[in-house]
A protein has these predicted regions:
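Core SAM-dependent methyltransferase catalytic element
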Residues: 236, 249-271
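Conserved class I S-adenosyl-L-methionine
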Residues: 103-113, 131
Length: 271
């Protein structure tokens, strides 16, 4: 694992014109900005046309609040960006550094987005074949074509495969992969039981294979994760532990919370 961590420090993505985008999607900015402009217009109309001061003050407060919100999420987006604060790259380093893996066989990433973690895994283990699956909905500016383009520019296209998939029902037989990884994906699957999603990901992991599944594991969504970790141990899984990635990747819980990932935890173990 120390050697793996050394490799992570020497891999820097996004230096060949790749586009890894941001999980803070453009539509979010458009919506907040649009509402802010509307509120500002209504404030002006309330003061100077309708002469209703109470409404003017209300819309002015809403406008200011939305401007502050827009500044905040712009800062968050910049911190996560591969061309900015590179926080997400640090998260990826932490995830892979916890895998006790010799580099042979196949790796699956559940929810690959723009392909960044899949590509980093391929660069870390030159003998491995890495498969990234994603639903690629309309909310984010990600696609299979974007992933393939990024992999080609990083020089790992021959070992990376990207395909459409659903985390609730993976289109692979039991015990298909030597490694399963994921990063901030499961909480986006609306209406799903988070622990069942984790078990579905572990279903396709080979006996003896390792996993590192990172997410914002709020108790109201995930339930008792310490209990779930014990459940895995009772099922025969080994070396199961929960890593506090809010601390390890972000440096402090307060900083992670400011970036809306204050409950970030990594489930690690061996099947």
């Amino acid at each position: 694992m120390k050697r793996n961590q050394w490799k992570q420090e020497n891999i820097r993505l996004g230096t060949h014109g790749e586009d890894y985008g941001s999980w803070m999607s453009n539509p979010v900015f458009y919506i907040i900005g649009g509402i802010g402009v509307l509120a500002a217009v209504l404030a002006v109309l309330s003061f100077y046309v309708f002469h209703v001061a109470v409404l003017g003050v209300l819309f002015a407060i809403i406008t200011i609040a939305l401007v502050v919100l827009l500044i905040w999420i712009t800062w968050i987006r910049r911190q996560y960006a591969f061309g900015g604060g590179r926080i997400m790259e640090q998260v990826h380093r932490v995830i892979l550094s916890h895998l006790d893996y010799d580099g042979d066989g196949k790796i699956l990433e559940v929810g690959c987005g723009s392909g960044a973690l899949t590509i980093r895994a391929a660069l870390t283990w030159p003998k491995a074949k890495v498969i990234g699956i994603d639903y690629w909905g309309a909310v984010y500016n990600y696609s299979k074509a974007l992933c393939e383009k990024n992999a080609a520019r990083e020089g790992v296209a021959s070992r990376c495969v990207f395909q459409h998939g659903d985390a609730k029902q993976l289109d692979f037989p039991d015990e298909s992969f030597d490694v399963v990884i994921s990063n901030y994906v499961y909480h986006n699957v609306m209406g799903a039981d988070m622990q069942k999603l984790l078990l579905e990901s572990l279903r396709v992991l080979k006996k003896g294979g390792v996993f590192a599944l990172n997410d914002d594991m709020k108790q109201k969504m995930y339930g008792d994760m310490e209990g779930f970790a014990q459940k895995l141990r009772d099922m025969g899984y080994e070396e199961v532990r929960l890593v506090d990635t809010a601390q390890e990747a972000f440096g402090a819980h307060r900083r992670a919370a400011m970036m809306m990932l204050g409950s970030s935890r990594l489930l690690v173990g061996r099947k």
